[in-house]
Every structure is written in C-alpha cells, then in structure tokens.
C-alpha cells in the first residue's frame, strides 16, 4: 500500500503542478487502532510554483482527492500550513509527530519538527481537543447503543487533554501510549482495552450497549477539563519572521532550477 500511496502522491504532483514535501498517516492507523477496513488517511504538505505566490487573487490552498478504495488523500499548501503552525494547530502538530511517514522530501518537515515545541500552545490545544470531545459526545454517544469506533473519537481527545495537563507537551498520537500513561483505574482501563481489541478485530461498527464506567469517565472529565482550561494562560509567541524565512527558503529550495 505504501508504494501505491507514493504513486498517488506523484500523480497529484503532476496533475496540480506542485511539489509535495511531506506526507503522513493521520487517522486510526496512526492512532494505533486500525481495523482491517480502516481508511488510509494520508495528509500532505505541498508547495505550488513560485508564480502562485505572486497572484493578486487568493488561490485555492488545499488539494482534496475523492476517497477511493480505502484511500483518503488531502493536503495543505505551505503558506496555509505555516499560518496554522503559528496558531499551534493540533492536527498539524500530529502530522509532524506521526510514526507513519509515507514521503518526505527537502528540509521543510525537519525544520518544522525542530520548531514545534516552540509553536506548541497548551491552551489552544486543550480547547481544540475538549471541544472535539464535546461535539463527538453530542453526535455519537447519546443513544442507549453506541458504535464501538465512536468511543475513540471522544476518549482520545480527552486523554490528549490529560497529557497536556500532566506533561505540558504535544500529546503522542498512539492511543495505547496515552491510555497506559494516564488511565490508572483498573475497571476503566480494562473496558478501554476490550474496546481497543474489538476495534482492531474489525468490530468497530458493531453496536454496543452503553458502557457506564466509560460514560461516567467521559462526563466527569469533560466537565473537569472545561473548568481547568479556564486557568490556562494564552502564550504569546510571535514566530512570524522565522516562518516567513522558512516559507521563502522552502519555495526557493523546492523550485530551484525549475523544480526538476
């Protein structure tokens, strides 16, 4: 599958006239709980030709391919990426932490990895993750029966918040790492481990009666984290000059001698 993904990325480069500098897995496979039928959620960063940056019109800055045969591919243009990086965008920071790298060219991703600790804003990340958990509770966990996979759409962001509270660093993508570090209560952890195994076996769409210990944990932690988040201080870090240089240097590096 990796070679097929690389072939698709090369096709995108040719079709759109861009250069891809980084492509990773960002979905359940990167989170450590894929099933046999899980999509490959490929996310990439790309650089258009120099002329793109000199247009007076705002050009489209995303590429989205139709989902086909378990392959879900989309990407962000570099300037958009850097603007989001400056805001400590959690999905982007996760991309830069992914253990499943499908493609990396030039020096862009390595430079971003070196800067990500400086860019990380705990307050922004906690609010991102806890609001994701709240939305997903509303959308997926209201009934008396719940699809197994939907629990993880709530549990992972809650554990990400707990990680930030405890360590003050970017949370790891792998759910098992988060769970083993943060979940101490035996009954709760056992239920999570059971769900994890069932998810990996392909039972992710099976309906499960509400698991009280998990729902209690979710309700308690969402309320607690929302209160705790009010005490977090927004950090003001201006990385504009540094990221402007990275943008300019990357465009020059990628399209030197016509980008051949």
Swiss-Prot record:
- What does the record list as coiled-coil region(s)? 214-252
Origin organism is Bacillus subtilis (strain 168)
Gene name linked to the record: ycgL
Q: Which UniProt keywords apply?
A: Coiled coil
InterPro entries referenced in this protein's UniProt entry, alphabetically: RlaP (IPR018775)
Q: Name one Pfam family in it.
A: RlaP
What protein am I looking at? Answer: Uncharacterized protein YcgL
PANTHER family registered for this protein in UniProt: NUCLEOTIDYLTRANSFERASE
């Amino acid at each position: 599958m990796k070679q097929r993904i690389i072939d698709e990325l090369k096709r995108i480069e040719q079709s759109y006239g861009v250069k891809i500098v980084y492509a990773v897995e960002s979905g359940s496979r990167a989170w450590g709980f894929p099933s046999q039928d899980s999509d490959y959620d490929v996310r990439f960063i790309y650089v258009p030709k120099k002329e793109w940056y000199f247009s007076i019109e705002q050009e489209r800055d995303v590429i989205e391919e139709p989902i086909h045969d378990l392959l879900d591919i989309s990407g962000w243009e570099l300037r958009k990426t850097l603007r989001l990086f400056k805001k400590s965008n959690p999905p982007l920071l996760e991309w830069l932490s992914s253990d499943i790298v499908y493609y990396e060219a030039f020096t862009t991703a390595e430079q971003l990895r070196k800067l990500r600790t400086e860019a990380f804003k705990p307050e922004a990340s906690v609010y991102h993750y806890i609001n994701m958990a709240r939305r997903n509770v509303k959308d997926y966990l209201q009934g008396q029966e719940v699809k197994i996979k939907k629990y993880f759409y709530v549990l992972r962001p809650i554990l990400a918040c707990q990680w930030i509270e405890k360590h003050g660093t970017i949370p790891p993508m792998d759910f098992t790492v988060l769970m083993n570090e943060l979940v101490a209560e035996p009954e709760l952890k056992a239920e999570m481990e059971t769900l994890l195994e069932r998810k990996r076996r392909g039972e992710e769409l099976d309906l499960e009666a509400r698991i009280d210990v998990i729902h209690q944990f979710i309700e308690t932690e969402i309320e607690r984290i929302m209160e705790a988040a009010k005490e977090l201080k927004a950090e003001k870090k201006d990385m504009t000059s540094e990221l402007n240089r990275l943008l300019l240097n990357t465009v020059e590096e990628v399209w030197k001698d016509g980008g051949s």
